[in-house]
Amino acid sequence: MSAVLERDAGALPRQVEVAIVGAGFGGLCLAIKLLEAGIRDFVILEKDQEVGGTWRDNQYPGAECDVQSHLYSYSFEGKPDWSQRYAGWEEIHQYILDTTEKYGLRPYIRFGQQVDGAQFDVKSARWSVHLRSGETLQARHFVMATGPLHVPNLPDIQGLARFKGKVFHSARWDHSYDLT
């Protein structure tokens, strides 16, 4: 079965031309540009269950971009109607979702696929990409598009064990927790 047929069936392809790690701004942009170049033999490996990267993860109250909103869009997919100069996470994430749909990227994404490692084999000129599930796929090109913020870092604060409240990272906001 070809990689395209396997991808359409939702299975993880065993071999692709390009393996992209991460379905945030970077990984999705690369996928769009590959499609525009006529390259369809690729897969996006996303550890979570939705696209969006930082803007999927950081859903804390008041989260918004720290640069003007129009800079948080692809140059080829402008958004002139941002609701405010510094858009909130919901609007930015919706832009990512809308762009994903517009360019038909979902069939290329494999959600829940954590990459544990990759090795390049000089003889075959291919990457072996190892997934947490135990599966391995082969790729001619391997692109890390995870971004610097995909793993929350809780600092080691002296006395934290004595704190009586709940401790959680802003990238793993607990919306059920009452802060009042």
Where do the protein language model's features map onto the residues?
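Glycine-rich active-site loop/strand segments that organize a redox cofactor
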Residues: 47, 56-95
